[in-house]
């Protein structure tokens, strides 16, 4: 089929090293929770700007200019 190279063998050993194994403990859950909270805050700010419940000086939300 194909030739075996040193780089290919190295990448294969790195890629398959953790296959089928579950890390004990919480793993990446705290990081994902933090990212989820940041996304939620961002979406709430966008919703407040859209509903004009968050007023910014010098910034008006007017959809008449949108074509």
Swiss-Prot record:
Keyword annotations: Membrane, Photosynthesis, Photosystem II, Thylakoid, Transmembrane, Transmembrane helix
Cystine connections: none
Q: Which GO MF terms are attached to this record?
A: phosphate ion binding
Q: Does the keyword Phosphoprotein apply?
A: no
Gene3D superfamilies with a match to the protein in the record: Photosystem II reaction center protein H (1.20.5.880)
What is the recorded membrane topology of this protein? Single-pass membrane protein
Where's it found, cell-wise?
A: Cellular thylakoid membrane
Q: Which GO terms describe its cellular component?
A: photosystem II; plasma membrane-derived thylakoid membrane
Chief location category: membrane
User: Taxonomically, which superkingdom?
Assistant: Bacteria
The record's listing under InterPro entries reads: PSII_PsbH (IPR001056), PSII_PsbH_sf (IPR036863)
Record keywords: Ion transport included?
no
Q: Where are the transmembrane segments?
A: 27-47
Task: Give the record's GO biological process terms.
Answer: photosynthesis; protein stabilization
Name the HAMAP family for this protein: PSII_PsbH
Biological function: One of the components of the core complex of photosystem II (PSII), required for its stability and/or assembly. PSII is a light-driven water:plastoquinone oxidoreductase that uses light energy to abstract electrons from H(2)O, generating O(2) and a proton gradient subsequently used for ATP formation. It consists of a core antenna complex that captures photons, and an electron transfer chain that converts photonic excitation into a charge separation.
Under the subunit heading, UniProt states:
PSII is composed of 1 copy each of membrane proteins PsbA, PsbB, PsbC, PsbD, PsbE, PsbF, PsbH, PsbI, PsbJ, PsbK, PsbL, PsbM, PsbT, PsbX, PsbY, Psb30/Ycf12, peripheral proteins PsbO, CyanoQ (PsbQ), PsbU, PsbV and a large number of cofactors. It forms dimeric complexes.
Q: Family, per the entry?
A: Belongs to the PsbH family.
Spell out the protein name for this chain. Answer: Photosystem II reaction center protein H
Which species is this UniProt entry from? Prochlorococcus marinus (strain SARG / CCMP1375 / SS120)
**Which gene is transcribed and translated to give this protein?**
psbH
């Amino acid at each position: 089929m194909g030739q075996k190279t040193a780089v290919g063998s190295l990448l294969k050993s790195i890629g398959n090293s953790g296959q089928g194994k579950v890390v004990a403990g919480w793993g990446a859950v705290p990081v994902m929770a933090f990212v989820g909270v940041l996304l939620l805050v961002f979406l709430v700010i966008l919703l407040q700007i859209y509903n004009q419940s968050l007023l910014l000086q010098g910034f008006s939300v007017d959809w008449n200019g949108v074509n």
